[in-house]
Amino acid sequence: VVTDGDAGGSDQDLHQQMGELRRDEQRRACERLGVAELVFFDGYHDGMVTPTRDLVRDIVALIRRVQPTLILTLSPEYNWSSIYANHPDHRAVGAAVTDAVYPAARNPFAFPELLDAGLEPHVVQEVWFQGGPSTNHVVELDQADIEAKVRAVREHITQFDDLDRMENWIRQGASDAGRPHGYAGAEEFFRWDTRG
């Protein structure tokens, strides 16, 4: 997680506590999903993220440490059909992840200080982008998947003024994504195979 979300929420009385509240909400949401490890980056301010060299380096370091074959991230592209997909922080993180995956994470000459720290180059095989203007990959969700997603999102109490509305939006989105494929529910992505 790049920021602690300290500029999010709508309750101004909680402004001083917002960063820690949002971190706690993220921890609980990840527990609901069975996430084994949650990493928070430090030094990036909510609402002010840009795909800087420092952010790319931090993502490269994480990629080299974890060595994933697949990364899920947000699209760096504008999606004019959905205002929610266009948060500038989300697009900036998507751009930084893209630059980190190729070429930096696999290039031994990129960020030599990481190599000196024992973080060897790594090739991420696929990146799945969510929220972009186009999709080319669908993952079927069963009812348990949808319920887990709803429970996780409901942990973000300070993020959403109307959690029931958000739950309905999640359920409807899963249904809409699944319908053309004969699924009760689905999640759509743009899938980028980085192997060529």
Give the ranges of each region predicted by the language model.
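Active-site rim/loop-helix segments in enzyme catalytic domains that contact anionic ligands
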Residues: 1-67
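Metal-dependent de-N-acetylase/amidase catalytic core
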Residues: 51-196
